[in-house]
Amino acid sequence: MGARFIRIPPYQHLLEYLKVLKKYFKANNYAIVHSHINTLSVFPLYMAWKCNIPIRIAHNHSVPGGENIKRTGLKYILRVFSRVFPTDYVACSEKAGRWLFGNKNFDKGRVTVIKNAVDFKRFRPSAEVLEPLCKAMNLNNKFVVGCIGRFTFAKNHKFLIEVFENLKKRRENAILLLVGDGELHDNIHKWIQDKNLNDSVILVGQVTNPENYYKLCDVVAVPSIFEGLSLTTIESQIAGVQVIISDAVPDEAIISNGCVRIDLNKDLWVNKLSTLKLTEIKLTENSKAYNIDIASKKLCEYYLEKIK
């Protein structure tokens, strides 16, 4: 299809943001505006409506949690308007679709679920790529628990570190590999230091090649408090790595025999991680929906159907 990137002001500067959007919408004869910014899609789709763009797609990728009362409250306010300006509703999962667009719309088939697509080939890195990383971080003969994602309230790093602290008493060779950055990074770093876990926890930071880090792990942990889908869960299984998830992760994310869901109970997580046996991961048939080669064709077909 081809694409070009246009820099616009951040939405926090709303008037300037809308002014620039209006300029580009007016200057180009767009048939479709597809917004992926969840409840904030209200703003670009409002301007698309003002500019008489015929097809306006709101795409939701998340559900709210209790991370910040002000932020969560804003999401609930914007949700009221999220069904006003779109002509079409899309979500990454049933859970995300029902939350933003309502049970009635979902049950009547007005919400299209489009999976977050993944390039499967990227998640099978070669030994030449993995061995230097493994050596640099001294991971040979270690039991590596990975957590790949932003350091936010939703991802629940504090819970995982408390679980890991107890896991070390049962598996002395355990290492916690944390990949990512975010607003709580410094707080989590201090939490690790306070628990004297510096020698057992590796903070990798933000990376551009997360696919290489999945295969360094024996298991990936996703103890999320809330999730719209959990791309980390999907990617872990595609990489052939077992993953333990919380009950906040939707069913759609389970695409193999190597995904285990456990309630957010520390003892249960410690027991599972301490007794985990490595197994060969076999993807299920529904994993194909996440393959970018298939999903991209479906998205093109979706657009073409809309502009008929």
Segments predicted by a language model, with ranges:
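Aromatic "clamp/platform" in nucleotide-sugar-dependent glycosyltransferases that forms part
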Residues: 206, 225
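A conserved mid-protein helix/loop that constitutes part of the nucleotide-sugar donor-binding site
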Residues: 143, 147-169, 183-190
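Short His-centered aromatic/hydrophobic patch
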Residues: 35-41, 60
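A charged, aromatic-enriched C-terminal amphipathic alpha-helix characteristic of glycosyltransferases
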Residues: 278-308
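Short hydrophobic beta-strand element within catalytic cores of glycosyltransferases
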Residues: 242-246
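Nucleotide-activated donor-binding/catalytic signature segment of Leloir-type glycosyltransferases, i.e.
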Residues: 189-205
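Acidic anion/phosphate-binding donor-loop and adjacent secondary structure
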Residues: 13-16, 98-105, 109-110, 115-136, ...
